[in-house]
Regions:
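Contiguous, function-dense segments enriched for cysteine-driven chemistry
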Residues: 43-44, 92, 127, 147, ...
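Surface-exposed short loop/turn segments
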Residues: 17-26, 90-140, 149-154
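Sec-dependent bacterial lipoprotein signal peptides
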Residues: 1-16
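Sec-exported extracytoplasmic/periplasmic mature domains
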Residues: 84-92, 111, 172-181
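Mid-chain, structured segments of secreted extracytoplasmic proteins
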Residues: 69-97, 104
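Short secondary-structure boundary motifs at beta->alpha junctions and helix caps
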Residues: 60-72, 138-177
């Protein structure tokens, strides 16, 4: 019995000291409007993450070793909160029982990093689909953002997070300033 307890204790301690997977901070910043487009129009916001994999970065160190890096925060919830703030700043109100709905679909959010001995190249890509639906119909729009950054030596997790957050913020700004989406929501919600 003592051996069993000792073995279980060793396994528990070993599991605690196992190296943790690297993670980066994903902090989307909502693009807020300075004035209301509407007053009190309601919608129901939902979101879904349809990415094939849940990591947000792939780091290729060139030694046939590709390492995925995940986000510390839940990507879907972070983006949903940012979109809700954007619409709120435009005068739309999120409600659980509205006949109008907005669906945010995360199709891609990834930074690929290639390291060589002397430099790194980071390519970020974010694709979000926004569907605004009313009883009379719906509008589906896809928003894309890309960025490329090169740097000396290897890229840190902070560098990777900066590229990803910058691309996400560009896409959020594009959504906030999209005239077709604004007009559809203003006239039909």
């Amino acid at each position: 019995m003592k051996k069993l307890i000792l073995a279980a204790s060793i396994m528990a301690l070993t599991a605690c000291s196992a190296p943790q997977q690297e993670q980066i901070n994903v902090m989307p910043e909502a693009s807020l409007s300075s004035s209301n487009l509407v007053q009190g129009k309601t919608y129901t916001l939902t979101s879904k993450d349809v990415r094939a994999a849940q990591y947000v970065a792939l780091v290729d160190s060139g030694r046939a070793n590709i390492q995925p890096i995940h986000a510390k925060q839940n990507m879907r919830i972070s983006l949903e909160n940012a979109i809700a703030k954007q619409f709120e700043s435009q005068g739309f109100r999120d409600s659980v029982n509205s006949e109008n709905s907005v669906v945010l679909e995360i199709q891609e959010a990834l930074v690929t990093v290639e390291h060589t001995i002397m430099e790194n190249q980071m390519d970020g890509k974010v694709t979000l689909e926004v569907t605004a639906e009313t009883p009379e119909g719906k509008l589906v729009k896809t928003f894309n953002g890309t960025a490329t950054r090169t740097g000396a030596l290897s890229a840190s997790n902070d560098d990777i997070a900066m590229v990803l957050n910058d691309v996400i913020d560009l896409v959020l700004k594009e959504i906030a300033n999209d005239q077709e989406l604004q007009t559809y929501m203003k006239e039909r919600f």
